[in-house]
């Protein structure tokens, strides 16, 4: 059966929280709001589907009014092969399947300077959204943001490094308020985006939702998973991440999802899981690892609970093992030979 992971991260979830604020706007705090109170990003809902080594992110950014430019930064597990307009109602249909309709979509982040440059891998425009896929470490992405007129919230360096250590790929979605108004977009209108990512290591970013927030600020998000069988999760559901729905997806739901634009990859059968995030920002210090192989072994590294082991460090350590072994053996032989030569020492 095809292997599929779908994660509606209301995740990238509420967050992908406050990403970019132009210098004319205030830094992100509890979501992005302009210094004049006119700019706001609503809740973000994202569907991340994993099938045959390809991850599909379908996310939507909700226009909450205001002018200027503002946006969101999303950590990605790999380099996208395509970024295009997403299905018109897939995310709403998932919400409808598990709960009464609620506001979807999320907010943004804000960035500061560094002396590094991120590599731009892809640029495209979808409606009033300017999409840029970046490759670089935390300082690289921060520098790119400042070079493009955005600010960095105080916690951004730590959060960006948290993700860059696992995957140096980020997607910046910048909302042009004036362009949205010219297009006739109303407050609450969403722009769906479908991101296709070849990867062997899918995960759902959650910590990014707290970017720019105060420790006590609340994070409210929905995470949908669509897998072949009941998935293994790390961390397991807990007080601030409750399991709201876990059962086989109905044929009607899967048929509806496949009927939407760009959603033909949805399988004939799957397990539907819904997690609800209701947490203080300071307590959301992890991501969500999902094991879809049936081995019941989600990765602690993918969950952000362990640091990734770098090739350099492992290579150095491994290369030292034989050298140290030879040195130790030589020392033992030398001591033994010295003991034999010492006068007055009787051998057993």
Which residue ranges define each predicted feature?
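Covalent nucleotidyltransferase core used to form phosphodiester bonds in nucleic acids
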Residues: 108-117, 121, 135-174
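C-terminal segment of classical bacterial N-terminal signal peptides
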Residues: 14-25
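Short hydrophobic-aromatic micro-motifs
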Residues: 56-58, 128-135
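Bacterial N-terminal signal peptides that target proteins for export
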Residues: 1-9
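Surface-exposed, glycine/proline- and aromatic-rich loop segments on solvent-exposed faces
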Residues: 49-99, 145-164
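A cross-kingdom signal targeting lumenal/periplasmic-facing segments of multi-pass membrane
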Residues: 80, 84-127, 135-141
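Accessory, solvent-exposed terminal regions and/or long lumenal/extracellular loops of proteins
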Residues: 27-44, 51-53, 79, 152-344
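Solvent-exposed, low-complexity, intrinsically disordered
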Residues: 346-348
């Amino acid at each position: 059966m095809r292997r599929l992971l779908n994660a509606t991260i209301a995740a990238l979830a509420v967050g992908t929280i406050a990403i970019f604020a132009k210098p004319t706007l205030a830094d992100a705090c509890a979501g992005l709001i302009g210094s004049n109170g006119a700019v706001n990003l609503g809740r973000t809902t994202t569907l991340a589907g994993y099938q045959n080594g390809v991850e599909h992110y379908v996310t939507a950014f909700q226009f909450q009014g205001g002018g200027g430019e503002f946006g969101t930064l999303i950590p990605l597990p790999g380099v996208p092969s395509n970024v295009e307009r997403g299905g018109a109602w897939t995310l709403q249909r998932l919400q409808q399947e598990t709960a009464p309709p609620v506001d979807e979509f999320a907010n943004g982040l804000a960035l500061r300077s560094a002396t590094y440059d991120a590599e731009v891998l892809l640029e495209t425009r979808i409606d009033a959204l300017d999409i840029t896929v970046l490759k670089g470490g935390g300082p690289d992405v921060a520098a790119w943001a400042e070079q493009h007129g955005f600010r960095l919230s105080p916690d951004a360096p730590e959060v960006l490094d948290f993700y860059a250590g696992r995957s140096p790929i980020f997607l910046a979605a910048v909302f042009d308020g004036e362009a949205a108004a010219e297009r006739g977009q109303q407050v609450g209108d969403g722009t769906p985006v479908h991101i296709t990512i070849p990867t062997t290591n899918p995960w759902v970013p959650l910590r990014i939702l707290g970017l720019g927030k105060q420790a006590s600020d609340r994070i409210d998000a929905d995470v949908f998973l669509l897998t072949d069988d009941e998935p293994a999760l790390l961390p397991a559901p807990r007080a601030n991440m409750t399991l709201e729905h876990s059962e086989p997806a109905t044929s009607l739901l899967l048929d509806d999802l496949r009927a939407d634009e760009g959603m033909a990859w949805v399988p004939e059968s799957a397990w539907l899981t819904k997690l609800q995030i209701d947490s203080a920002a300071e307590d959301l210090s992890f991501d969500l690892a999902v094991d879809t192989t049936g081995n019941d072994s989600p990765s602690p590294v993918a969950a952000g609970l362990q640091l990734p082991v770098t090739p350099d460090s492992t290579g150095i350590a491994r290369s030292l093992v034989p050298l140290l072994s030879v040195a130790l053996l030589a020392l033992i032989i030398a001591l033994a030979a010295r003991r034999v030569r010492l006068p007055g020492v009787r051998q057993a």
